[in-house]
Amino acid sequence: MSSKEQEAQKGKQGWITPTVIPPEEWATFRYRGKTLEELLNMSMDEFIKLLPARQRRSLKRGLKPEHRKLLEKIRKAKRLAAQGKKVVIRTHCRDMIILPEMVGLTIHVYNGITYIPVFISPWHIGHYLGEFALTTKIVQHGEPGLKATRSSLHIAAK
């Protein structure tokens, strides 16, 4: 296999099963030149200025009630995690923008059928939760056989 084919295969695998970057490597993270610690210490208004236009505009309008409720759940889960208890955060809010305070948590995002666990790393900041819980499967076509096409309807089954 050539190097290009290997790179393409790696890319496919990374897309189908996203790789999780371990917390030890988070020290190298920068978002618009800011470290994770700097982002966590910023006010919401300062953070909003760093976001792309679509997300910035959405957050300037204010959070929806569902998003506020999700943030309360996240803060409660962080408090309980400090005490040693584990809380599962489930949400239908696919349009929630990932904020720095969500980093390190696993949020179960609804994709229309089930809840998909999404581990949030610093590289997810500024994206939407729904981007990481795909709503459709990747099509893998099977082999043609009986009843696969209209012409095969006239072939006698054994």
Swiss-Prot record:
Keywords: Ribonucleoprotein, Ribosomal protein, RNA-binding, rRNA-binding. GO terms for molecular function: rRNA binding; structural constituent of ribosome. PROSITE patterns: RIBOSOMAL_S19. The keyword Ribonucleoprotein applies. InterPro entries: Ribosomal_uS19 (IPR002222), Ribosomal_uS19_CS (IPR020934), Ribosomal_uS19_euk/arc (IPR005713), Ribosomal_uS19_SF (IPR023575). GO terms for biological process: ribosomal small subunit assembly; translation. Pfam families: Ribosomal_S19. GO terms for cellular component: cytosolic small ribosomal subunit. The keyword Ribonucleoprotein applies. HAMAP family: Ribosomal_uS19. Belongs to the universal ribosomal protein uS19 family. NCBIfam families: PRK04038.1, uS19_arch. Protein S19 forms a complex with S13 that binds strongly to the 16S ribosomal RNA. This is Small ribosomal subunit protein uS19. It comes from Pyrobaculum aerophilum (strain ATCC 51768 / DSM 7523 / JCM 9630 / CIP 104966 / NBRC 100827 / IM2).
